[in-house]
Amino acid sequence: VNGINPVLEMSKFTFSAPMGNFYVQYMDVLSNGGSQFLIEIGNGNCFTNISFTGCTVREVPRSIIRMNSNDAMAESINIDNCILKNIGLSGYGLLNIGKAGTLNSISITDCTLWEIGDQIIDLRVALSEFEFSNCTFYNNETGIPKMFRLEKQPKMITITNCIFSGPNGGSKVNSGNSDYSGWLSYAGCYVTSDMVIDSREFNDAISLEYTSDDLFIDPTNGDFRFKPELKFDGEGVAGDPRWWAN
């Protein structure tokens, strides 16, 4: 209503049987903390395709989606045009895919990730495709130790046109849980100077000479528009498109 999504305050989504498509669209999904995971798949009662589109999802103690069963048969997980805030602060990360009978693709696109704990994804199954593109990542108070934990290398992986930013709770960050430099590129991505990189660098990313406070209008309060006087090269190209100048 009037550009404001209705608030859905809840514990978790539960599936009592296998189902087809499950779509969450244009909702402000607020976890009440009653469950560690917004969606937890521990058996064959699973979706075929799931998507979050145009949503705000916030205050989930662990993951938005956790899959941990070889009986789970799924095709895709898609998160698009969402703001994801205060997720995974108790561990496990934004997405946690430990086991699955089948899962072909995961995409996170055109999103803002704001205060994310542990990792963006913990992936331990073989995917055909993983995409993380046009996202703005900002951690101010939260220290994320690594962006991605990819125990299984996807057949195709794309991480591009993203901005990784913020002081990260004063902690250093690795691009991955292990050395993925032989097959993982961050080409087209930017890293602000206040995000201090540990031993595993963001391969092919552009390291900026200025901080997130220099780049964004008011990042600590969720305004990730670029400061116009900066004339940032990534304007209209990198990060969540909602923050680009019209």
Residue ranges and their predicted role:
Residues 224-238:
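Functionally critical loop-and-helix segments that line ligand-binding/catalytic clefts
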